[in-house]
Amino acid sequence: MSDKSEEPAVRPVTDVTFADDVLAAGRPVLVDFHAEWCGPCHTLAPALEQIAEENAGRIDVVKLDVDKNPEITTQFGIRGLPTLLLFKAGEVVASQVGLLPKARLKAWLAEAV
């Protein structure tokens, strides 16, 4: 059983925390740009949770609500949802727009990392 006080596998980030949580991270970070109203984003969420758990300690997985965080959304030119950006050493090294099945998402991530 999981302890409810544990941090979720996919942590939220904001315009304020993005630089520390993503750009200055010591390992690769997968950012899920999503919105509450986005159906495909909700469909993708369980796969991202599993990927975060499977890669704990190797890759951080975070999510950013585009409606609540317009600064970062604009900075990275996010237009379609869901959008996934993979960062290494503060730089975008891979991107994916749209919903992918979990197997394809895992393959994309493995190739990008």
Feature annotation, model-predicted:
Residues 63:
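Conserved residues in the N-terminal Rossmann fold of short-chain dehydrogenase/reductase
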Residues 1-30, 35-60, 68-75, 79-83, ...:
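Proteins that catalyze or organize thiol-disulfide redox chemistry
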